[in-house]
Amino acid sequence: MNMKNNADLEKLRLHLANRLTELAKENLNLLITLNSNNYIDIDNVIFDYDSNDYKEFSKTLADVLKYIDFSNISFAGFKAAGVNFTGYHNVTINPQTIAYKDLSNSVLKGVKFASRTYAEDIFKDVLLVNTNFTGSVGAQIIPETVKNLAGGKMASVTFFSKNNGEMFKGCDLSYMDFTGSYGAIVNPQVIYKKSLINTNLTDALLVRNTSFDDCYVTGTTFSGQDISLNPQTLRNKTIEHCHFNGVEFIGDDEMFKDIRILDNDFTGSKNAIIDVNAIVGNYIEGNNFADTTILNLLNGKRSSLPSQTKHLKLEGASIVVQNQEEQEAIQNLYGLSSNTKFVSQKDNDEAYLNRVVDELLESYLTRKLTK
């Protein structure tokens, strides 16, 4: 047989796949090291090559790749885009040498990235759209040299930058999840289109005194970020699917005026005032209003109000009412327990005035304490 002949090579692959399958039945932890010899290159067995001499895993071996130790296998020229490496052993990749510098849509669990110094920047110009780094080892990324990180799951990644305030300058962070990453510092004013659409900021830091002016915030998870947000300064007038834990809202009773708010979770936020009459269409379905203050819950012009009660969560909110009759009507309409917090209009106004005065005095008190 001639191992340079494609037909004979395919027969060899079939025999190898069958042998590994049988061995795996005897040893559930099977891990085999394959070696080249003087008449066959192991790369030609494991990989198929295209006309550009780029390579991909042989489909014939797809079910047994998990039994192969890749320690001595080079992935230079490998078409890694879209590949799920989960379950493969000892794969080491240098992103600068893979085909087209493309790791988009790949799942990199277990992959080790070739160790490099900061100056060498092994992810420079590499495509990382929808890339899942969870469970990988050694991924060190300088974001401004990558730009498009949209859709990425960045667990296990360490981020670096020479200028932390502009670490993600020009980068697309939409649909990106920072959970489990290290070192990320985000300035919404310098990212691509100022957009945090469906961005999960868990384990990232936002720059001090973060401004969200003209930013697009929807589907965003803040997860304990210590930041202030005025909804009126956002570019988008529909805010949905956000998790506002840690966010302090600033503004008066009309902070959500002319804004649609749908399916958000306000748990862990501060000072959010929900005036139902000010919201577009008075439509509040799907929101978890824990830790908010709600005005005009009963008086809003809501033709579809009864249909909203099913997915609306009011436990943990402070509901402002004019009198006992209004409180009872709200309890009956929404099926609320007697433990729901209701606040009189007078007490709510007093609390609001106290908070505003505290804010006005804050700078004075701070200066006095530092003298």
Region spans (language model):
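Non-Sec secretion/translocation targeting segments of pathogen effectors
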Residues: 1-4, 365-371
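Tandem repeat scaffolds
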Residues: 9-17, 21-354, 358
